[in-house]
């Protein structure tokens, strides 16, 4: 059975503890995409990663490893979640289905004090996936553009699609629907 794992990004600590804000796994387009995949008989999960405002790779890995991951798995990561997937793919030999990195962030400016992004990118990670597609935006922050440039330059056979959706969050997109991402996931 096909399945999908959709990983959220890294909110600020203040935003994370804001009582009226949704959990990161329920923000933006993530719940909409999860539902659309489920009604297409793809078991989709949007796990809530621990302390997303101060991500620890081992803690995230412990949650991620609870899921079945194989050639029928679609992996989708937004921002820091995309960066997590790049590291996971770089450090593992498991073959997966599609990988879609939405505004992936790999901390090229070394903002994080943790070792979350302390890894070497596997230039051949595309060999471990049916395909790897990066969704970027021409009006995202420069640090995201820098991350995307680095990934496009280092990963062989990566595809790129450009949009005008900012950081692919609700405040930039003005919608919780993301049909372009759904189409890429199921095509």
Question: Which residues fall in each region the model found?
Answer:
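Gly/Ala-rich beta-loop-alpha elbow adjacent to hydrolase catalytic centers
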Residues: 76-86
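Active-site nucleophile loop of the alpha/beta-hydrolase fold
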Residues: 9-10, 48-52, 99-109, 137
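Conserved alpha/beta-hydrolase fold motif
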Residues: 75-76, 99
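Catalytic histidine-centered segment of alpha/beta-hydrolase-like enzymes
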Residues: 55, 165-178
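Conserved alpha/beta-hydrolase "acid-adjacent" motif
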Residues: 140-147
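Short beta-strand/loop motif that positions the catalytic acidic residue
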Residues: 128-129, 133-136
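Catalytic histidine neighborhood in serine/cysteine hydrolases
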Residues: 152-170
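Short, surface-exposed "cap/lid" segments of acyl-processing enzymes
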Residues: 1-40, 44
